[in-house]
Amino acid sequence: MIIMNTKKMLFIVVISIITIQSYSQNSNEFRIYYGFSDSELIRDVSLVGAGSQYAENSKEFGIKYLKQLKNNLSIELGINFLKSDLILNGAPMIPAFPTTYEKLEMISIPIYANYTLWKYLFVNGGPILDFQITENSIDSQSGIGYSIGFGGKYDFNNFLIYINPNYKRHAVLPFEKENYHQRLTEFGLQFGLGYKF
């Protein structure tokens, strides 16, 4: 009787391990990516007589981890590094403030939902937690923002390649709020490689 129960228990454990392992192989994904974006510093209102600030040459790279929650739905977590060139023009009525140039660097933690459509397409989006790591003359971009995107992917064995056009808006809820707060806005494109395990 004890031997029979032990065999049943061993059988259940082995089946459970095989099931968990096969589920795990389909439910985890690691991605690395590189991207660039057309960036702009936007205020909610236009300030007359103020200087102008521009963001150019925005580039990013990062890693992502996707955990499958349901058949087509995954949670997408990661860490992203953004670098951008800032061009700061003084107020037109004050010639003593010439044009200056700065580097903006920021680390972001995206927390997205990722939904696969059919086999080769997906949509993703959600909040972003941003930490500006450079001191700049623009309003701080540290805070909570959001992103929405769509993309295409192609799987081969356990690997995949993908492309992900996206829209991001930073500092929607800034940690340090200023009057007429500037918000970095990006229309970007990411290229990446993934591995399923």
Give the location of each predicted region.
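Short glycine/proline- and aromatic-enriched beta-strand/turn motifs that initiate or cap beta-hairpins
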Residues: 23-78, 168
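Residues that define the transmembrane beta-barrel architecture of outer-membrane proteins
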Residues: 26-28, 55-61, 103-107, 140-146, ...
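Outer-membrane beta-barrel "beta-signal"
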Residues: 29-31, 154-157, 183-197
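Residue-level detector of the transmembrane beta-barrel scaffold of outer-membrane proteins
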Residues: 29-33, 74-78, 122-124, 160-164, ...
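Residues on the lipid-exposed face of transmembrane beta-strands in outer-membrane beta-barrel proteins
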Residues: 61-67, 79-81, 109-115, 125-129, ...
